[in-house]
Amino acid sequence: MSPTGADPAVLPKYEHLYLHVPFCARRCSYCDFAIAVRREVPWRSFADCVSRECETRRVREQSALLRTVYLGGGTPSRLGAEGVRATLEALRSHVQWANDAEVTLEANPEDISVDAVIAWREAGVNRLSIGVQSFDDDVLSWMHRVHDAASAVRAVEAARMGGIAAFSLDLIFATPERLARDWEHDLRQLIALAPDHVSLYGLTVEPQTPLGRWHARGEEAEAPEERYEREFLSAHSQLVGAGFEHYEVSNFARPGRRARHNSAYWRGVPYLGLGPSAHGFDGATRRWNIEAFAGWQRAVEADRDPVDGQEGLTPANRTAEMVYLGLRTVDGLVIEAEETERVSAWERAGWGEVIQRDGQTRLVCTAEGWMRLDALAADLTAFRSPS
C-alpha cells in the first residue's frame, strides 16, 4: 500500500510534472506567491530535498514517461547553472521523460547570460519562460523588479545565442494610472523581440503584498476597469495581427508553439506537483504541499509526505471546473443542444461563438467574452447544476 493507503495498482500514471522552486532575490511589489528570499541559494539541499520528496511519495511508481516538466517559482533561474543541473538530475533519478518532452525553466532577465543558457540547455532545459513584465524602467522599479528594460532585451539575445530558441515572455498590464505607462510601446517592444509565446497578466491587488498595503493606505489605486479592458483588447489585436494565436485567455503562441505543460492543466489532466506550496491533481483529488520552504524541507528531511491539504472533487466541483477550463481556451466548451439557446445572448453580445468541430457543438469565447469569463462560466455552471 502507498503512504496514503491507495492500491499501487491503481495509482495515477502522471505525464506532467511541476516543481516549485521558491527562491527569489527580492519580493515583487504585487507578489503573494510562496517564495523564499535568499542572497545565497541552497541549491544542493534543495536538490536533495526534491529527491527525498520523490522517494517518500513513490513518484517512480506513479509516473509514466513524462511529456512535460515545468520548473516554476519563485525564480528557478536563481538556482544557477549547477543548481538547475542538480535539480534535474534529482528528478531524473526517479522519473524519465520523453526525448521530445517540453522542459521549461522560469527565468528572470538578470539571471540570463549566454553561459547560463548553454548550461541549462546541456542540463536538459529546452524552453524558457522569461519574466519581463514591462519595458518601462520606472514601472519595473515600482514593481520591485531587479532588472531593467535593457537587460530584458539582452536576456532574449542571450537565450537565442545560448541555443534555447523556444521562449515565452511575460508582461503585466493594467498598472496604476499615475505611472503613465505607455502600454502600446511595451507591446511594440515585445513583438520586436519575436518570442514564440507570450503570457499577459492583469495586475491584481493582493492583501499581503507591498501593493496591497499601499492600496489599503490609499497610496495606490487600481487601474480603471475601462483601461484594463482597453489594454487587454489592444494586446489581443496587436499580437494576433503579428501572427500569434490567442489560444487561452492569458496566452498567445506562434503556430505549433502552445505551452504544452499549461495546456495539460487546461485540459484537466492529472499532473504531479513537487516542492513547497506545489499543487497536484490525480484526476479525482487536488492536493497541495506545505507552503513555507523551511516547513517543506523539515517534512521531506524527516521522510514525511509534505502534503498540507487535499480536496476531492464533488460532482458540482467537476462541473464548474469543466465549464471554466473549457471557456478559457479557443478549443472551447462542448455544449448540449438545450444550452445553445442559453448562450445565444452571448453570441448576440459578441462574447462567444457557437461552432461545429469534430462532430461536436462548442462554445468559444471571443476576446471580449474572456473579459467576462468569470460571469459567463458562473452562468453556464448554474444552468448545468441547478440547485
What are these regions (language model features)?
Residues 20-35:
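Local cysteine-cluster metal-coordination motifs and their immediate loop/turn environment
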Residues 2-16, 35-60, 64-337, 386-387:
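C-terminal scaffold of the Radical SAM
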